[in-house]
Amino acid sequence: AGTFWKGGNVWVRRTVNVPEISKDETLYLIYSNDDIATFYINGVKVFSTNEVHHNANVALDAMATAALKAGENVISATCEDTGGLAVLDFGLAVKREGEKLVLLNTAKQISADVQATQTHYNFVCGPIDLQVTFTAPLLLNDLELLSRPVNYISYKASSNDGKKHDVSIYFEASPRIALDYPFQDSMSEIVYDGDMVYVKSGSVSQGILQKKGDDRRIDWGYFYMAGDNGSTVAGVGKASALRSCFVQGGDVNSIGSKGGNDSGRMALVQNLGKIKKADGHVLIGYDDIYSIQYFEKNLRPYWNRNGDKSIFDEFNSAAKEYSSLIKKCDKFDRELMLDAENTGGREYAELCALAYRQAIHAHKLVEAPNGDILWLSKENNSNGSIGTVDVTYPSAPLFLLYNPKLAEGLMNHIFYYSESGRWAKPFPAHDVGTYPIANGQTYGGDMPVEEAGNMLILTAAVCHYEKDASYAAKHWGMLTT
């Protein structure tokens, strides 16, 4: 349990027991601060910062290390809150001896090409050229596909010396992908369903929608990585054991099928045999179970808004549609680059491609209890607000262009908030909460002129792009109040 701190200045002393320290060990100060902080060990200044940090670390220099002794030591800190959030936390850590290096050679990256829905990488791995593509089929005209929580990692391996070579592809994922902080307990396992084999991981606690705010990572629901059962072998265990097994040509499944924390690394292996050319892919996804709390009601993700689908249904659909979706993504990426380049030149086109996924992934698609589409944004490092109107406004052109219904989804929650009487002020709210909890505005200040202007202009833009004034008519009472 922490000590409540309202703001201003705070001073903290902690007594810690330190065992005998080896000269070969590196000690670190682990700290979080908001805002200005200075840290000391036994009266010796270690570190000072004017910037906000969360779970950061700094190696102790020779003077700070020399100030430590075996037994009791006093770590102290002072922190000044200059406004907004206030936090101070700190401790010591010792760097553990690293795991033995198993994968001795590093692939040489030749290129990276970021497109709207895909990123393409080229590597040279000795006598093998390897192309790797990450695909997120975020096609905005298809809401079912847009909300499907499954992406692809594809690869093409080809000999660069004209000879056949034994080729196997190894994929590894850490359980940290499903945790807020690294020290949380996790559990990973292998799951078989139909023609697919999965590795799955999630936190032990599974506190659904229990956290909100900035610098938070989802720690409920489960991460999945999957491949065709006929060509994919799965394993769970320590990273060193899985990698050693792979390098030695063993079966990673023999390492284990279930494990927690450090023993919960997940691996998939696809053995291509002795080849000159081959290709394949795996699927990755995340089932968040419930995505948003919307005025005291927990909402499922849009793809499972009726609660009648499973994550395995989504993976199966993604597997069946792999070839067709890759073609659609290739076509869309080409068209976006061509349109953008014709409009603003090559550099502008590259910026559009870079921003496409970023803008989309800043939002979550759910359906409101009244059937409205909700396309809810999250502010990063700015209160963590959800559905912020002045964040909606600059992202709106993308959604107006490709699917105006999503632009409606940027505003539906704000209209509902006022029309329901929950927000009684004569201008739009700034937000509807702190992500992912949308129970009402949490930002400290109103912005009546800015937010009203944003809502009026965007409503007019939706009607213009839809060539239909129905959306404005639906909310006419609020627009003219």
Tell where the protein language model's regions lie, with residue ranges:
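Extracellular beta-rich ligand/substrate-recognition surface
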Residues: 2-11, 48-56, 256-261
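Extended, low-complexity, turn-rich repeat/linker tracts enriched in Gly/Pro/Ser/Thr and Asp/Glu
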Residues: 31-38, 82-84, 160-163, 288
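Aromatic-lined ligand-binding clefts that engage carbohydrates, nucleic acids, or primary amines
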Residues: 16-43, 75-77
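Short beta-strands within extracellular/lumenal beta-sheet-rich domains
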Residues: 5-19, 58-62, 120-121, 266-268
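Aromatic-rich carbohydrate-recognition surfaces in CAZymes
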Residues: 309-325, 384-481
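Short coil-to-beta strand junction motifs in C2/discoidin
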Residues: 31-35, 114-116, 149
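An acidic-aromatic loop/edge-strand motif
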Residues: 1, 62-99
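Acidic/polar, glycine-enriched structural segments that form the non-catalytic walls/loops
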Residues: 73-75, 96-106, 120-125, 138-150, ...
